[in-house]
């Protein structure tokens, strides 16, 4: 053997050794991941006490799948990637499903979905995809014999679940007997039991009041409510169910998933009205995007969209792995709940003196953004939630909602955690904090010179929710106050070019932007000024009501509490706060300085009687071309109308733009409330309710 050959052989042996080492490392990591996933599945499915969020579980599963893809020899039949997650509790009788209840594979991006759809259509083109919302609840299997419900069971491990028949019988949406003339001899259906989101908050409040631990989320509430030894407890909870799949059946002959849903509905089973059959992959992705934007318009929590090949013949040909069908997939949305570490609890002093504790977190990505801080509301809330500094906590961020710490993961405590102690003095000005009788909030009473309150009130006045002063942000407000160029919100509209002389960071362009922003803000609607004054309890709803009814700041300032309380959306508490605010000479001086700065203190038409839309209640849903939600709302309110966020029998019109919220649109149809498109909305504003009503045709309810 030559020198070169010996060197090459040595290189090959070294490379082989490296590969063996790498394989050993990945083998160890795969075993570690398998153990972790088994433990998390047990806590989730059996104990209903998960210690990680769904997104973290999914990430661990995907890591194990990637290792097994690189090293197929590590993929064993008992790997978590090859079997249905879950098990069954020993508290209930185990029962075997007639047909296996499989899980679903997940995709998280358009590219991953395209790849899955291409595999599904490899042998035969798919001409119909059924799309439905993925409910975040508890999977349940129902068996009907001769039309009678004989058994209900949890998913368990997909083969064996827990017999929860007495508990499921208490659900109003689950029929004890199927209806209709052609009832199947045998019918096994699968569905999701869920806890309506609106009722979830009520349940947790009742549990806390009774001294019991609250549920972390609606899914846990549904699982905990179903796994009760006493069915009367289950019956007291507002559980609901939607059926979304078939198991074993005899005498139930249909050709497609959509056809099965229609037949199941005829039999009296609860089927979602929000599924759609679509022809193309792009249509499917549009459905996924649409419901991603409207996921909070649904009565239950959803964490994605399930996409199925609609044709049963194609489903049979595609078959399934040991874990999931090849003809269905779950397109998961970005997580809204994750776990992270609570590094510290600090306090923030707000514009009205309220001292609010907030959590400082290990930065974590949730709902599409990275979060490092989250509200804890007040000291009582810290106690109720039982969070300690150093805890691993469940963090929730739904859409545009402020991130919130939901609960601690108590099982992960190691003894190093410590309790939070509320400060006794304001961290900004040193004033002793007070807790007014009957209130949960602790406050700094120094409204005159507390730097935090002055800074926050100026920033709030300029914010988009108030006067929307372009260029006057938090940093600018801080500098202007610190340098003595303004002293409170009363000075803001007296800013002039010379006010910025000698200040670093204020170029001519920046100064011009602020002055233009002030000029535009001088003519904002009255309700925006009311919000900007930082009167306690006065938010947009109360401010709009006061502006609509009284039309000028002078009328509001001089009205007795009884008159203010009679305004829709106000009430005695807000009325008293308004009276108290205007009774303070310092506040009257602030208003006088705002007025002398050229700000309009009355809406157009003040004192002229009712507006043209007086008594008209409008709900706006979807996107209106040329209108933001705020400007559309102001257009209605400036004419005396009222805009609300939910449809009821009191609603006069529902204005539906592009991509309207399904729940509002459907409820309008059910209640036969006139629907207006953008053209109809323009007629409503220009010509009034009668003219708009003539254009709008009440939607008829099918059937």
From Swiss-Prot:
Q: Which residues form the active site?
A: 134 (n6-amp-lysine intermediate)
| Stored SUPFAM superfamilies | BRCT domain, DNA ligase/mRNA capping enzyme, catalytic domain, Nucleic acid-binding proteins, RuvA domain 2-like
Identify which cofactors the protein needs according to its UniProt entry: Mg(2+); Mn(2+)
SMART domains from the entry? BRCT, HhH1, LIGANc
Q: What is the protein name for this chain?
A: DNA ligase
Reaction(s) catalysed (UniProt annotation): NAD(+) + (deoxyribonucleotide)n-3'-hydroxyl + 5'-phospho-(deoxyribonucleotide)m = (deoxyribonucleotide)n+m + AMP + beta-nicotinamide D-nucleotide
Instruction: Kindly list the positions annotated as binding NAD(+).
Output: 54-58, 103-104, 132, 155, 192, 308, 332
Q: Does the keyword NAD apply?
A: yes
EC number annotated for this UniProt entry: 6.5.1.2
* Species whose genome carries this gene: Parafrankia sp. (strain EAN1pec)
Instruction: Describe the family membership recorded for this protein in Swiss-Prot or TrEMBL.
Output: Belongs to the NAD-dependent DNA ligase family. LigA subfamily.
Domain of life of the organism in this record?
Bacteria
Alphabetical GO CC annotations of the entry are: cytosol
Give the EC class as a word. ligase
């Amino acid at each position: 053997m030559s020198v070169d050959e010996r060197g090459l052989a040595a290189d090959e042996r070294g490379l082989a050794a490296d590969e063996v080492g790498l394989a050993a490392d990945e083998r160890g990591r795969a075993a570690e991941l398998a153990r972790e996933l088994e433990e998390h599945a047990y806590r989730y499915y059996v104990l209903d006490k998960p210690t990680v969020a769904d997104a973290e579980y999914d990430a661990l599963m995907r890591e194990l799948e990637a290792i097994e893809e690189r090293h197929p020899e590590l993929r064993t039949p008992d790997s978590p990637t090859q079997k249905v997650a879950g098990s069954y509790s020993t508290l209930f009788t185990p029962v075997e499903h007639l047909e296996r209840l499989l899980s679903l594979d997940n995709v998280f991006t358009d590219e991953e979905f395209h790849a899955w759809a291409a595999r599904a259509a490899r042998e035969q083109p798919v001409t119909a995809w059924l799309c439905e919302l993925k409910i975040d609840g508890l999977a349940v299997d129902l068996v009907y014999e001769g039309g009678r419900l004989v058994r209900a069971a949890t998913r368990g491990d997909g083969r064996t679940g827990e017999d929860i028949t007495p508990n499921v019988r208490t659900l109003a949406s689950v029929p004890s007997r199927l209806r209709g003339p052609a009832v199947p001899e045998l019918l096994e259906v699968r569905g999701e039991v869920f806890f309506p989101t609106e009722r979830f908050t009520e349940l947790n409040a009742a549990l806390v009041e009774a001294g019991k631990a609250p549920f972390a989320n609606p899914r846990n509430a549904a699982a905990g409510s179903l796994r009760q030894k006493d069915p009367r407890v289950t019956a007291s909870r507002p559980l609901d169910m939607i059926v979304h799949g078939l198991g074993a059946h005899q005498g139930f002959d249909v050709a497609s998933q959509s056809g099965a849903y229609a037949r199941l509905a005829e039999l009296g089973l609860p089927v979602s009205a929000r599924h759609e059959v679509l022809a193309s992959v792009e249509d499917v992705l549009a459905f996924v995007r649409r419901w991603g934007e409207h996921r909070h318009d649904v009565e239950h929590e959803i964490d994605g969209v399930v996409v199925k090949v609609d044709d049963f013949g194609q489903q049979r040909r595609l078959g399934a792995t040991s874990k999931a069908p090849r003809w269905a997939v779950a397109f998961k949305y970005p997580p809204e709940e994750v776990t992270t570490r609570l590094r510290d609890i600090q306090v923030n002093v707000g514009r009205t003196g309220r001292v609010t504790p907030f959590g400082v977190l290990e930065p974590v990505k949730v709902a599409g953004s990275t979060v490092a801080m989250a509200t804890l509301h007040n000291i009582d809330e810290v106690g109720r939630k039982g969070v300690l500094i150093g805890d691993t906590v469940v963090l929730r961020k739904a859409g545009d909602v402020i991130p919130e710490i939901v609960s601690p993961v108590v099982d992960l405590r190691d003894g190093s955690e410590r309790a939070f102690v509320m400060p006794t003095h304001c961290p900004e000005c040193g004033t002793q904090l007070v807790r007014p009788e009957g209130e949960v909030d602790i406050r700094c009473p120094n409204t005159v010179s507390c730097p935090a309150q002055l800074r926050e009130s100026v920033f709030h006045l300029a914010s988009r929710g108030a006067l929307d002063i372009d260029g006057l942000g938090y940093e600018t407000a801080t500098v202007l106050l610190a340098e003595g160029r303004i002293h409170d919100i009363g000075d803001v509209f007296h800013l002039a070019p010379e006010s910025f002389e000698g200040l670093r960071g204020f170029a001519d362009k920046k100064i011009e932007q602020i002055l233009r922003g002030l000029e535009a803000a001088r003519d904002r609607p009255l309700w925006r000024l009311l919000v900007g004054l930082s009167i306690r309890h006065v938010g947009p709803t109360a401010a709009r009501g006061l502006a609509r009814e009284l039309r000028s700041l002078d009328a509001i300032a001089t009205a007795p509490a009884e008159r203010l309380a009679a305004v829709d959306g106000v009430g005695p508490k807000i009325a008293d706060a308004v009276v108290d605010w205007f009774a303070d000479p310092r506040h009257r001086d602030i208003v006088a300085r705002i007025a002398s700065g050229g700000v309009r203190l009355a809406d157009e038409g003040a004192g002229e009687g009712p507006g043209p839309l007086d008594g008209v209640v409008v709900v706006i849903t979807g996107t209106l071309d040329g209108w933001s939600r705020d400007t559309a709302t102001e257009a209605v309110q400036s004419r005396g109308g009222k805009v609300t966020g939910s449809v009821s029998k009191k609603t006069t019109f529902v204005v539906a733009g592009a991509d309207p919220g399904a729940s509002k649109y459907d409820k309008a149809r059910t209640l036969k409330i006139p629907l207006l498109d953008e053209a109809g909305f323009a007629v409503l504003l220009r010509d009034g309710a009668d003219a708009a009503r003539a254009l709008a045709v009440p939607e008829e309810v099918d059937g």
